Amino acid sequence: MTDVKKESDGPEPYSSSAFDFTLLPDYNNDFINEDDFAEFAKALAAPDHLSPSTEDLTAPQPETGKFSANNDWKPIHQRVRRRKKSKAPPRRGKDETREGFVYVLLKWPLLVVVLGWLLFLSIAYVFTRLYIYLYEHMVTWRGTRQKLRRQLQNASSYEEWIKCAQQLDTHLGSDDWKKNPSYSYYDSKTIRKVHEQLVKLRQRAESDETGKSTEKHVDGQPRAVEDLRALLEACIKNNFCGFENPRLYSETYYGTKDAVQSFIEEAEASLAFLLNSSQLDAENKRALFKHLGSNFGRTALCLSGGATFAYYHFGVAKALLDAGVLPEIITGTSGGALVAALLCTRTDEELKKVLVPALAGRITACHEDTWTWMKRWYATGARFDSVDWAKKCAWMTRGTPDCVVWSAVLASAAVPGILNPVVLMKKNRDGTLSPYSFGHKWKDGSLRTDIPLKALNLHFNVRFSIVSQVNPHINIFFFSSRGSVGRPVTHRRGRGWRGGFIGSATEQYLKLDLNKWLKVLRHLELLPRPLGQDWSEIWLQRFSGTITIWPKSIPSDFFYILTDPTPQRLARMIHVGQQSAFPKLKFIANRAKLEHLIQQGRRQYRPRGIREDIQAVLSEDDLQGLLKRTKSKSPSEEAIYPLSGSESSSSADFSRPGSPITLPLGFTFTRKNKKGLADLRTDPKALTDTPNSPSLSARLTGWWNTKSPRDSHPSTPKDPSRSLSPFTHHDRPNSMFELRPPKEVRDLQARTHGRPQHRNSDFLEEIRRRSSAFVEGEGSDDEGRAGRYRRGDVDAGAQDAEVYGEPAEFGDNEGDGEEVQSAVGLGLEGKGL
């Protein structure tokens, strides 16, 4: 992990091939569908029904009433004053805030005083940061330390950066800190004990796996693999004992405590062993990795807004991609939404070719001249046209077929005054577009929630966030007095404060006081709301995550804040973004080691993925041959399906592929939910000694006949000559599972061949139809939909276990409950459907 392979990575930002736009994938394809954009323009032009200030042109006009003169003596040329149209209701009425006389009197004086104090604090904060900067460069960075630091900053690749970082750590004496396990920001004793126990249990489990174990297993005692599983379930949790505390990575330029690193590597080895071990069945592995995934959580990459500052995100994403730790969950806001859309609509190999300076040829949103956008801004209140931006954005989102990503990108970038609120679009079944959420219009999300950590945790179980923060108005306030991940405090070899204690204390006080007075403005509602927006949120929301990356901008970025980048400027921004992400990669890689194994286990052992193993049971040629043999047989020939080979059936009027057979009293199918065939237990003594008895359906039918006389029918054996062919309604098997029934079931056919049949009542048929487990199939009738699970097929689960290793439950059903449903007194036990 994070070992750079030169042959697989994309070109460097300053290489000649990185400026060749012809090497970009799909460079000449705009992915523009004119019909889609016509629907988008139509939705934008529609009146907003939710806004009382917008006239609805589609509503029926009120009838004009008749008028008459008051009298005949008034002058006919008298001027009549027109009634003034009522103004739009205020955005915040008096009854909304319960404004009184004192509020109106003191609002503006208080606002002036608070804004003046905020201005003073801001100036003081700038001078404090300037003092800290001069202190570090004049006191801290001198001699060999400054030379090694300059080499670290000029590293062109991550491999080169690691070498420079290790040299700087050795010079600063950080190697001794790594060897000492004690640290107040994590539980070192528990981590050490868990690591030792993991090593012992994994070695014992590996010996049991290979058969080289000298210990004898005693019945009733748990095996080593079970103890290892229980220990991993207890310790593989988000920030277990503080092993994911960012402070553990803030004392060195590269790496962390040796005890923490050893624990992570051993946890990775133990997870890999359980993933491939044969001592645990598929059901136990599925439950294990689902439990670990819920406790450990997911990692998300969050890209902030910031207009053209967002192009620094390309470098951050490139560093994560080249290191192999780019998360699967990516979110972006405003300008970051455009970068997130590009990352999520392309493969890793395509991204390595796209994240290059030549991409600037595809970023043309600000191509219009000054006179054009000024006229538009005066007429519409927005600098840019929404439909034009949608067409420019189509290539970045690659014309996604299932959802309209470009409309979401525009909605996230709709800053008041820059882009008017837009309508989200959704794709219908026929491929056309229509407005989403009743045509409601959306605007820039960064004004309220730049980093949606709560929503990510709620919907995707995100517990670890990587934030790339480039907002220019907030970057200056990112300051870690005791160092950050991969950027330790070098003053007094890491035991001091940045800029000394006085400098750090002053910085903290000013920043907290600024935040306090901004909250006063918001809670007292002193700040005006231009364009109907509460602008205090752009300062008071959370802008950081577990790891926060803030690329260093330069003053010229403010001048080009609303212009398209040139290839040269984009190359610099990609390079700076990469450099800013290098110090964080080790921390991210340690997290990704465990998360990738957990997600691999979840994908491999979820029920949907098991269907891929059918090729190991029957090949495509085998299936085709069996289907041909099925169609070539005449109705009089014997059925090739063992389950329906008998002409008698206790639960149906005719035999069919996959029909259940009547089981003798005493034969049990006691199975836990989703267990394999190894769990099937038969009692040979019961099979030989127990006399034959009526089937379950026959008993229920007889009982129902006593309750419902009009539906009562005598239970008489069915004439074999009148038995329908198993292929009357099916010319092929209902599913592939019917081709290989369990061996235990095939052995029982001789015992059930001559059993009497009984006609079922309509009521029982309705019960079975409603309680049958439906599987995917072709055809619209009940036989095709229910397949072999109709009419109480208790052998279906066992048949699945023979083919797949667990019952075939299609879809991502990850319920962990274990059910055992028994038919007491009827001689049958089976899985409740």
Curated annotation (Swiss-Prot):
Residue ranges crossing the lipid bilayer per the database entry: 108-128
Bias (Polar residues): 689-707
Keyword terms, alphabetized: Hydrolase, Lipid degradation, Lipid metabolism, Membrane, Transmembrane, Transmembrane helix
Subcellular location: Membrane
Biased composition (Low complexity): 644-655
Annotated membrane topology: Single-pass membrane protein
Motif, GXSXG: chain positions: 332-336
Annotated ranges, domain PNPLA: 301-457
Region of interest (Disordered), ranges: 1-20, 49-71, 630-657, 680-833
GO annotation terms (biological process): cellular detoxification; lipid catabolic process; triglyceride mobilization
Catalytic residues as annotated in Swiss-Prot or TrEMBL: 334 (nucleophile), 444 (proton acceptor)
Gene3D superfamilies given in the database record: Cytosolic phospholipase A2 catalytic domain
Reported function: Probable lipid hydrolase.
UniProt record similarity statement: Belongs to the PLPL family.
The name this protein goes by in its record: Patatin-like phospholipase domain-containing protein SNOG_00918
Source organism: Phaeosphaeria nodorum (strain SN15 / ATCC MYA-4574 / FGSC 10173) (Glume blotch fungus)
